[in-house]
């Protein structure tokens, strides 16, 4: 039962082959048995899950239907869940129980999903390895000595290990797509504004976007259907109709123009990954796609711009965690300043502190123009490069990551080395574009992803291309040994 995809679960529940309650019990037992090896969950919500599963079964018995009705999922632990700890992977929020549900959580609950728990993540979503979590590192089910990617590493590891069919995640600079690549999953970062950020604890407000992590493009389509849509509570949410993503998965790729940026294949890319990307290109050509070389000339400036903008926004967003209203508070503060300093010093881990300091520096009076303003100008240039490219092509294709998953601890002493692993993913966040990573093969037994980017609100196009690719390849069906 644990091998079933979301689409298969929907069919099984509709055909009364099993109930949501039966499935939920199987998966909860599996999580209890196997997750100690992975550390992919921060909180398990067994009582809530069984309650929701029973309610979903009653709804089905009363004639209701729906692809997500009775489907078990988990939420990345930065989506607020009413009455349940929402920690953001940080000591700062270890004692925080959200007083309300995030829009994503309430929308999916209304669609009938069953919440199995909250997944581990890099602290405040800052990281690409899921090693900065206060609850300990998450391990990659494909090789327990390697990282699963970050910051949505818990969601990725849990889905890859077949502990559940799909999970919610968020992407600020690649935090859905990079873990998807490292764990052989399909992960989609939607257009900025497609999925509500209300109740999603902010890292960098102009870059953060929630999306699905699953094993197939079809499952991503099903989960995105439940997450997407306008939300008046989120001022950055965009009132754009949500298409039927699953119904759009049958389009031919004949004549589809795929752009391959020459900048993607320079120094720094593992040549074995480059070969796998070429194989993916050949597969799509067989399906009728036309390949064109394009250029994204400002890509080289994207990482420095991102690592000014994201920490700058984080330093502002994280100023609310001061030990006063919620979150960690130091013991016996001498005065208000001592309360602030010690609460924040004790509550935030080293990577979060590093980014707050970088961000505060970039926003400071003497350096604002030199750093923050310049980074925003580069952001505009990156966006313009994509606009020009999409005048000529329908999709942009390249590697998701320059290297496969590294060993746990390998990049801890050199944060910049870890930052450089985001080189292919951050441009989509800077430009607000939708991006998808799908399985493309293996290097030394570790999964590799191929990334697709599309124009604004063309998530359906990405999902269709990925679905057609997955109908003709079997990388996405491979399972890690021992799970």
From Swiss-Prot:
Cited SUPFAM superfamilies: Amidase signature (AS) enzymes (SSF75304)
A GO term for molecular function: ATP binding
E.C. designation(s): 6.3.5.7
Disulphide bonds in the chain: none
InterPro entries membership: Amidase, Amidase_CS, Amidase_dom, AS_sf, GatA
Gene Ontology cellular-component annotations: glutamyl-tRNA(Gln) amidotransferase complex
Keywords: ATP-binding, Ligase, Nucleotide-binding, Protein biosynthesis
UniProt keyword Protein biosynthesis, yes or no: yes
Reaction equation(s) it catalyzes: L-glutamyl-tRNA(Gln) + L-glutamine + ATP + H2O = L-glutaminyl-tRNA(Gln) + L-glutamate + ADP + phosphate + H(+)
Active site: 76 (charge relay system), 151 (charge relay system), 175 (acyl-ester intermediate)
Domain of life: Bacteria
Pfam families xrefs: Amidase
EC main group: ligase
Family indicated by similarity: Belongs to the amidase family. GatA subfamily.
Oligomeric and partner information: Heterotrimer of A, B and C subunits.
Function: Allows the formation of correctly charged Gln-tRNA(Gln) through the transamidation of misacylated Glu-tRNA(Gln) in organisms which lack glutaminyl-tRNA synthetase. The reaction takes place in the presence of glutamine and ATP through an activated gamma-phospho-Glu-tRNA(Gln).
Protein name according to UniProt: Glutamyl-tRNA(Gln) amidotransferase subunit A
Lineage, broadest ranks: Bacteria, Pseudomonadati, Pseudomonadota, Gammaproteobacteria, Pseudomonadales
Gene coding for it: gatA
